[in-house]
Structures are given as structure tokens and as C-alpha cells.
């Protein structure tokens, strides 16, 4: 026997009412760009009110536009920026402008939020990797923590 299907009311976020003993974090990512959501700022507020910390994964294209909202959100704990997304998705944006926005966000977030730059394209589209790595070194001199196991 299967439990009955239930739907949440339209005005209630899916994480409302969950209890902290089950998890401390909410992850905003997967199957879409969370920075595109028109209610992102409100979701961050609600997450904080419920006692959650948010980890957000983005392709980075909207970081410049959303920087103020993200940095002002107490619930936002960490931002993962998938730098490989630029080459893999054919974004209609200048590459240098894209990198400047991603790296500028990281510099503005220093000491306030955790920022993780991801470059997960080994064996795929990776011709931009040398330029990305040079840009990272220019903005964030080494040593870095490099994690190659996908953790």
C-alpha cells in the first residue's frame, strides 16, 4: 500500500515546517539556475527563519546582478560556482565578463560566505580551463585547496 499523494499549498515553500533534527542545510540547485527564481530572496529569508543554512549552486551568470541579495542573506552559508558551465552551455555572454562577475563575487564574499569554484569537466569540454585557472590565480593567489574527488 502506498501513502496518499499530498500537495503543498501554493503559498508555502516546500521546506516550511521541517525540523532541524533532520538537517541543518538546504541545497538550492539542480535542474535549473536558482538565481533566476523570482522569489529567491524570500526563500532565503524563510530558510533562515526556519533555522536552516543554505548552500546554493549556480552557473555564475547572474552573480553580479544578485550579489547584494546573496551577501545580505544571513541564511546563505555557501555558494558553489560551476565554472565549467560556461563552455558546456554556450552562454550568450562574454567570457571575460563572465569570469569577472564570478571572481568579483568571490572577492566581495570573502570573510562573509564560503565560495567554492567548481571546474568539473575532466574529459569533456575543457578548452577554457587554462584561462579559468589563470583568472583564478590572478584573483586568488595560491595555495588553494584543490579537491579532485568531487566532495
Report residues per predicted region.
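Structured beta-strand/loop patches that form or line metal/cofactor-binding pockets in enzymes
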Residues: 151
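Conserved glycine-rich "GG(E/T)P / GGGxP" loop and the immediately following alpha-helix
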Residues: 1-148
Amino acid at each position: 500500500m502506498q501513502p496518499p499523494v499530498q500537495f503543498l499549498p501554493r503559498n508555502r515553500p516546500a521546506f516550511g515546517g521541517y525540523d532541524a533534527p533532520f538537517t541543518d542545510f538546504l541545497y538550492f540547485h539542480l535542474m535549473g539556475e536558482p538565481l533566476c527564481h523570482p522569489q529567491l530572496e524570500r526563500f532565503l529569508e524563510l530558510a533562515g527563519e526556519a533555522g536552516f543554512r543554505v548552500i546554493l549552486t549556480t552557473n555564475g551568470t547572474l552573480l553580479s546582478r544578485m550579489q547584494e541579495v546573496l551577501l545580505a542573506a544571513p541564511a546563505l552559508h555557501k555558494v558553489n560556482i560551476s565554472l565549467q558551465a560556461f563552455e558546456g552551455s554556450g552562454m550568450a555572454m562574454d567570457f571575460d565578463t563572465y569570469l569577472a562577475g564570478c571572481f568579483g563575487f568571490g572577492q566581495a564574499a570573502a570573510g562573509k560566505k564560503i565560495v567554492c569554484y567548481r571546474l568539473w569537466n575532466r574529459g569533456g569540454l575543457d578548452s577554457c580551463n587554462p584561462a579559468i585557472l589563470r583568472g583564478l590565480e590572478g584573483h586568488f593567489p595560491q595555495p588553494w585547496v584543490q579537491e579532485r574527488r568531487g566532495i
